[in-house]
Amino acid sequence: MQQHHLQQQQQQQQQQEQQHLQEQQQHLQQLHHHAHHHLPQPLHTTSHHHSAHPHLQQQQQQQQHAVVASSPSSVLQQQQQQSTPTTHSTPTHAVMYEDPPPVPLVAVQQQHLPAPQQQQQLQQQQQQQQQQLATTPVAGALSPAQTPTGPSAQQQQHLTSPHHQQLPQQQTPNSVASGASSNLQQQQQQQNAAVAPGQTQIVAPTTASVSPSSVSSQKEDINMSIQLAPLHIPAIRAGPGFETDTSAAVKRHTAHWAYNDEGFNQHYGSGYYDRKHMFAYPYPETQFPVGQYWGPNYRPDQTTSAAAAAAYMNEAERHVSAAARQSVEGTSTSSYEPPTYSSPGGLRGYPSENYSSSGASGGLSVGAVGPCTPNPGLHEWTGQVSVRKKRKPYSKFQTLELEKEFLFNAYVSKQKRWELARNLQLTERQVKIWFQNRRMKNKKNSQRQANQQNNNNNSSSNHNHAQATQQHHSGHHLNLSLNMGHHAAKMHQ
């Protein structure tokens, strides 16, 4: 009961300290509130295990200790924690740790660490903030876990607990790891440290005292550990290792990321283009051709859409790179400027800028020539093909004679075919092909019309030359008159 009272008092203090921050962050609370509710079981399990299973929580903590021991500052913390006597040493604690660290003391000690360690904490906080933007709601959830009342108290503290402060802070530090936010987090850490002692250090292992993983501020480690907690236990076990690795690796990378975000996100929609151009700008002479090669490869779509027609995309790529090499200085400036207004499309405005900087002779003349050079070849080639494929239509006299012969016999003998070829000034091959085509046409017509085969043959074969030759098939015109409407158009094609 004393613990509960102490916790309540400390929580009230925290709430008072945090109200002014929360007023600013009320609009974020709902969003983060949902996030906290989604932090599934581990939070509640920790709150429920305050009395029953402290050893579970400290197993997590101990795992973190084991992994985190890498950084010297974390070693210091571990020493401090171990030096402090434990209020609750369950057999599991005794097995895993001789003296399980009483969390709250460690948290307080961290706050009182020498200045260099605090600086390290700040750095790590900033880095972890950037890492843990997604995980911040979890950190907040831990503080609610500190309340012995359980999930209900957790939800209440979701509104008041420092994690709301951390959420906005950590989101903003994403690109700018501001010292102010880190200071706020240290305040929160202190608050957590104050809360922890009242909690009989049971909740603490998952809360502020979890920090042994990398001396980085307790809050940050809480974020890491909690982030892993909602991922379920296997992730937690793997987590501390990742925490140390990420804290070490991100120490290098977060600086670069912050640099990219601050400097280049203003101009770019995507971080990948940022990197290439980040290198291209400072060293236009040496590395700018690389940027240019990137440019043509990434920009064919944009070049065609913005400045060029799809017809000479390849042409444009070649000449863009060439023009860029011709005037490295001009193109470097141009390539840097357009992103400001072309963020949605990446580098869509780039080609036009490139042309303007490189000069009309370099860029626009290419634009004019690009489409023209292939076209003449295409026209010549198509012209040749069209000439080859052109078929001189048969004269009316030739078609009429062939139709007459087709009436007598759809299949022409070699003798007759030779005579027709000589009389009509055609080759035998032409005559043969004409009869083949005529038979096919007749067949199709007969299929389309469900009339008798005779009617189809008569109509399809005779209506073309019905006016000219009426000697032997005048009797068919009665049938033709019925079918002429259908076949006239077909036969004269």
Swiss-Prot record:
MF term (GO), any: DNA-binding transcription factor activity
PROSITE patterns in the record: HOMEOBOX_1 (PS00027), HOMEOBOX_2 (PS50071)
Start-end of Basic residues biased regions: 30-39
Tissue distribution: Isoform M and isoform R are expressed in ectodermal and mesodermal tissues and central nervous system of fourth to ninth embryonic abdominal segments. Later in embryogenesis, expression is seen in visceral mesoderm surrounding hindgut and in two Malpighian tubules.
SUPFAM superfamilies: Homeodomain-like (SSF46689)
Signal peptide limits: none
Listed InterPro entries: HD, HD_metazoa, Homeobox_CS, Homeodomain-like_sf, HXA10/ABDB-like
Ranges of compositional bias, category Low complexity: 1-29, 54-95, 105-134, 154-173, 329-345, 447-475
Assigned keywords, A-Z: Developmental protein, DNA-binding, Homeobox, Nucleus
Subcellular location: Nucleus
Biased composition (Polar residues): 144-153, 174-184
SMART domains for this protein: HOX (SM00389)
Superkingdom of the organism of origin: Eukaryota
Disordered, as annotated region: 1-199, 322-360, 438-475
Similarity field: Belongs to the Abd-B homeobox family.
Name under which the protein is recorded: Homeobox protein abdominal-B
Origin species: Drosophila melanogaster (Fruit fly)
Gene name in the database record: Abd-B
